[in-house]
Amino acid sequence: MMTNKLHLSTLGIALLLLFGSCGGAEKKVAENDGLETAADRVEKTELPPKAEVGEGALVRAELIYPLENRPTPQVHASTLVETSNGIVAAFFAGTHERNPDVGIRVSHLENGKWTRPEEVVNGVQNDSLRYPCWNPVLFQPADGPLMLFYKVGPNPREWWGMLITSTDGGKSWSAPQKLGEDPAIGALIGPVKNKPVQLEDGTIIAPSSIEIEQDGETFWKVHFEISRDQGRTWQVVGPINDGVAFDAIQPSILIHDNGDLQVLCRTRQGVIAESWSSDQGQTWSEMQATSLPNPNSGTDAVSLQDGRHLLVYNHSTKEGEEPNGRNILNLAISADGKTWEPFMTLENEPNKAGYSYPAIIQSEDGMVHISYTYDRETVKYVVINPSDI
């Protein structure tokens, strides 16, 4: 459900070429009307140098497992959660994204060290059919078992959402369950990449999106899957965009002090897009462009205990001088969700596959934990002290 207000910012009107990505074909090209583009803004933004551990807010930075003797050739789409037993990470891993051998692996931070990741679920359907797994999302509700959402299917247009749960902090897991179907979107997806949020009344809102093929084009649309019974049933809200003004997927949810919700979304328009809700996610404003660039790559965001908001993202476009695309990874901070200031560069040294698909959480002790794909070969984990920002 959407409101009727539509106001694209200057940045949103001056669209870049639309690029395809995994799960989406290239399509329509918007005209540049001479206004400032995302690439122009990238050039004008002075980013800080790459952060070093012990300087400023960066407390820790390490690979979850070394490149040598790694358990699988490739890994992607990590997720983090804090449990009573500590920090847990999950990601999909196998020979290559989309290959049937890709499953979901889990690693635990124990006594200051990460355990070797172990596969906890895969896409085996029967003795002769196995699909790849995609985009795990860990979530610990206030009252209930640890949840691990993931997707199974041949591609993002045909996948479906699955769920396993754990009552011992991710040491053992329940049998997989399919999330179900909904008339608005078909198969329920669950949180498509980024973590759900839980409201004070216990409502869980999972940020999600779908990719729809129509007349030879692929349209990206954001929606929400909402549960009021600890994930047993789900209500779908949306899609909230038409996939034309903005091709948007993979939203992350911020919660503001006044109760308003805000989503920040990956797009194919060269910018991060946003939408707002003032009724606990039941209706949403029309999407607008933010001031931040996006090279068609995943982002994540978190609302801090002190009311500020952090966003981890690639501050770049697909074109221009290196580092561009996914070869730079940044942190930005905002007091109101509208004005963002890039304050830390996590990576800026070009490599083969870049730094991408970050996840970000804040633990009870106030520290901020971030994970992200590192050259598609391992996952990097960093810790930020927000009191030093």
Report the location of each language-model feature.
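Bacterial N-terminal signal peptides that target proteins for export
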Residues: 2-11
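Asp-box/BNR beta-propeller blade signature and adjacent active/binding-site loops
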Residues: 23-389
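C-terminal motif of bacterial Sec signal peptides marking the signal peptidase cleavage site
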Residues: 18-21
